[in-house]
């Protein structure tokens, strides 16, 4: 039994909001592992992401809306479950988004946070973090918000501020995969290539390009594994 199955299979999701949903990847996790749910609504500020999410998630109980998670356009206490996954480090104001999610969550409802962190990594996981941080710096240089990965303690500080009860935390290490798996190397290598092209758009971007080329070499020498994930579930008072 994996961590998601362990935690989610006992949950009746009811009406679910997935904030900063991107292309709806975490919604597919919820759909697979929740005991049941009546509806899942995914919101994201990017229209392109919403279009991709709709294309990748063909389910009559799953809907997508273009919406800023910092100003959620739903009534107070209108969802039974809220979730946000691998998105905190993309947010301009983490507290505002989490506060909005708590506002639309019903009392007693479940608040789910799943976020990568940078603690206790293998060398291959460290490669993933280095690539992620480099890409974040390239995005920042081009005016796109993309912050560095949080430490686990920083994530838990945000959770503490929400004042949830019956909080459960689990960690997914992500080290049960071959760091030199050809498919993974090809996929991550494509990500690096995309950001090398973006780095070429930066005035005086030679430093970014040099670092990207070093990361590409390290990727093929040492491999890559997914960063550790912290999964948190709590209830709103």
What are these language model-derived features?
Residues 83:
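A conserved beta-strand element that flanks and buttresses the S-adenosyl-L-methionine
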Residues 1-14, 29:
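Conserved alpha-helix/loop element of class I SAM-dependent methyltransferases that forms part
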């Amino acid at each position: 039994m994996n961590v998601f199955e362990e935690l989610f299979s006992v949950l009746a999701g009811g009406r679910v909001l997935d904030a900063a949903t991107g292309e709806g990847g975490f919604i597919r996790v919820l759909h697979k592992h929740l005991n049941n749910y009546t509806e899942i609504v995914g919101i994201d500020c990017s229209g392109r992401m919403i279009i991709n999410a709709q294309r990748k998630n063909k389910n009559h109980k799953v809907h997508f809306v273009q919406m800023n998670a910092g100003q959620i356009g739903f009534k107070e206490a209108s969802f039974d479950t809220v979730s946000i996954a691998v998105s905190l480090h993309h947010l301009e104001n983490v507290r505002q988004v989490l506060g909005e999610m708590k506002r639309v969550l019903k009392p007693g409802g479940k608040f789910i946070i799943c976020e990568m962190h940078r603690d206790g990594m293998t060398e291959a996981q460290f490669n993933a973090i280095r690539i992620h941080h480099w890409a974040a710096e390239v995005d920042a240089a081009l005016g796109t918000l993309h912050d560095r990965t949080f430490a686990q303690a920083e994530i838990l500080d945000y959770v503490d501020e929400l004042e949830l009860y019956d909080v459960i935390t689990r960690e997914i290490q992500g080290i049960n995969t071959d760091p030199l798996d050809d498919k993974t190397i090809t996929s991550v290598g494509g990500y690096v290539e995309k950001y090398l092209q973006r780095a070429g758009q930066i005035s005086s971007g030679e430093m970014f390009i040099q670092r990207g080329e070093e990361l590409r070499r390290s990727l093929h020498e040492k491999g890559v594994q997914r960063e550790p994930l912290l999964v948190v579930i709590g209830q709103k008072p």
